[in-house]
């Protein structure tokens, strides 16, 4: 027994046992899944016969079909209800639209009837009220003018039943006899023309008699009533103005003619005022433009004076570091700081004083003028052709000299115009004069390399100028170049590229075949 215990099982045997156990478990699980249980059967009752199982299945199917039919019937009923409700909603909306149309048609009919029936009555009532008010106001003015100046008490103005219904401060008409219809639009703003009609007579009377000034408020209120009634019913009875003017002429023709004259002259006066204002504005603009043009002309004159008075040295001095941001330089050449012109000490002093004066004048002219800002170097640049800056001469590369040296120092053939004769004639200077005197620019020219025979024979031959190596031609290309341009089989540049380099093994048989042929 001890020996058997001591004997250990191999690893493979243990693995086989584990595999067998796993297979058994899997088979059990598959057998349990394969068994089909009925839905209605209780867990305690397990059917054994196939006949009983078939019965159970049939009963379940019948129940499912009945439930399905019930659900379908319910859905149909719900759909019928939805359709009926939609029909009712559509019918109600149609009724609503029809009622709205009827309402709008009735309102339009009522408005047309009101417009047709009412205006005659309204116009007649307005005529009566305006006649009474205008007659009473004019009569009271005449009576007050004839009264004695020593009289302290004034007769109280008679209040008519028409005026009781009007509220002047609020601007609303509350007449007791007749009310305006709803459709008539009422404007609360008064026109200036009607206010002029009412107030013109009162102003004339005030100038004549001082007593009228006290009772002017009462008259103004009455006249306002007339203007309010006229203005508010302007849309209804525009044709009634002639009748009102005729009635007022019958009462007091002299004063009404005066008011009419004043009214007719009013718009002309307004137009004349507008014209005067326009003329004044135009004159002010012209004067401003003249002042600006004068200031600009003065500044230009100062500039020209500065240019004429300054010598070429100051002109060259003006062209300085400011030219870095000046892009208007076209033909001028920037002189180097080592190539300035030489002048005597007295000339320099006078030039410096002149330049200071010119700078001050330019600054004052800039303050006065409204022109665009320009850099200071721009103003000193517009000088004559004779007074240009010193340009750098070209190096004469093409010239050949008989000496055998590779390099030479050659003086320029054309000396600059502005340099005095001393600097041209004295190339050799002492150490003291080097800093003050401008030496002539010396150009180092390299001798072109030529064969020795030609160097000995030809003394000086002008070679062709050096040009740009790349030349762009805009001519129409030839047919061959057109064909080769984009075609990978005929394009030479494309075929010469390393992509199309064939291998050595591919080239050898081709050569051999050519040799054999």
UniProtKB/Swiss-Prot annotation:
Compositional bias per record (Polar residues), positions renumbered to this chain: 341-363
Biased composition (Basic and acidic residues): 379-390
Name recorded for this polypeptide: Shugoshin 1
Domain of life: Eukaryota
Record region (Disordered): 107-136, 149-173, 267-317, 334-427
GO cellular component labels: centrosome; chromosome, centromeric region; condensed chromosome, centromeric region; cytosol; kinetochore; nuclear speck; spindle pole
Extra remark beyond the main annotation: Shugoshin is Japanese for guardian spirit (as it is known to be a protector of centromeric cohesin).
Phosphoserine carried by residues: 426, 497
Molecular-function GO term, any one: kinase binding
Record's subcellular location: Nucleus; Chromosome, Centromere; Chromosome, Centromere, Kinetochore; Cytoplasm, Cytoskeleton, Spindle pole
Native source organism of the sequence: Mus musculus (Mouse)
Record function comment: Plays a central role in chromosome cohesion during mitosis by preventing premature dissociation of cohesin complex from centromeres after prophase, when most of cohesin complex dissociates from chromosomes arms. May act by preventing phosphorylation of the STAG2 subunit of cohesin complex at the centromere, ensuring cohesin persistence at centromere until cohesin cleavage by ESPL1/separase at anaphase. Essential for proper chromosome segregation during mitosis and this function requires interaction with PPP2R1A.
Tissue expression notes: Ubiquitously expressed in proliferating cells. Moderately expressed in the oocytes.
Keywords: Cell cycle, Cell division, Centromere, Chromosome, Chromosome partition, Coiled coil, Cytoplasm, Cytoskeleton, Kinetochore, Mitosis, Nucleus, Phosphoprotein, Ubl conjugation
PTM entry text: Ubiquitinated and degraded during mitotic exit by APC/C-Cdh1.
